[in-house]
Amino acid sequence: MKPYFCRVFVFCFLIRLLTGEINGSADHRMFSFHNGGVQISCKYPETVQQLKMRLFREREVLCELTKTKGSGNAVSIKNPMLCLYHLSNNSVSFFLNNPDSSQGSYYFCSLSIFDPPPFQERNLSGGYLHIYESQLCCQLKLWLPVGCAAFVVVLLFGCILIIWFSKKKYGSSVHDPNSEYMFMAAVNTNKKSRLAGVTS
């Protein structure tokens, strides 16, 4: 009877763990969408005074924010053009503006705690970010090269027709048999010079 109770206890514990009743960070949403961008939130304990928060995409460090207690909670960030951020009491939010499908990847946060001691470093929750492009964008990517190629073909065909018609028009006016003017035969100057040399 005892093994049965142990199995039930382990089963209930696993269910509570998977549903997030035991781990408080399981209900935390890491990604949220607003203003055409993605907000990636990384939570940390409220008691932390000095920290370094890094946002990773796979193994690449995208953003690194350092909060120090020195002169009025100074914040420094590496790569400020890419890393727009918002710092609150218990979270750092990084913003990805105008994401496209190439930025879909696994993102996670790494937290280094300096104060209160002891120094700790841990990886926080992560998640896979799927970014779907709209159907209109995909259709434009397909039809834009096709449309450009069709335009070039029509343009070339038009130029060839214009050249052909202009040559035909010019050629018909010169070789018109019903013209009142007759064509003159080309004069060969070599014959004259021979005759001039023979007579003298």
Swiss-Prot record:
Residues bearing attached sugar chains per UniProt: N23, N89, N123
Subunit structure: Homodimer; disulfide-linked. Interacts with ICOSLG. Interacts with PIK3R1. Interacts with TBK1; this interaction is critical for the maturation of T follicular regulatory cells.
GO biological process terms on file: T cell costimulation
Protein's UniProt name: Inducible T-cell costimulator
Modification after translation, per record: N-glycosylated.
Highest taxon in the source lineage: Eukaryota
Keyword DNA damage carried by entry: no
Disulfide partners: C42-C109, C63-C83
Alphabetical keyword list: Cell membrane, Disulfide bond, Glycoprotein, Immunoglobulin domain, Membrane, Signal, Transmembrane, Transmembrane helix
Organism listed in the record: Mus musculus (Mouse)
Biological role stated in the UniProt entry: Stimulatory receptor expressed in activated or antigen-experienced T-cells that plays an important role in the immune response. Upon binding to its ligand ICOSL expressed on antigen presenting cells (APCs), delivers costimulatory signals that enhances all basic T-cell responses to a foreign antigen, namely proliferation, secretion of lymphokines including IL10, up-regulation of molecules that mediate cell-cell interaction, and effective help for antibody secretion by B-cells.
Tissue expression: Expressed on activated T-cells and resting memory T-cells. High expression seen in the thymic medulla and in the germinal centers and T-cell zones of lymph nodes and Peyer patches. Expressed at low levels in the spleen.
Topological domains, Extracellular: 21-144
Membrane topology: Single-pass type I membrane protein
TM helices/strands, residue ranges: 145-165
GO cellular component: a single term: external side of plasma membrane
Residue intervals of the Ig-like V-type domain: 30-133
Effect of Y181F: Selectively abrogates PI3K-dependent signaling pathways AKT and ERK without affecting calcium signaling
UniProt signal peptide: 1-20
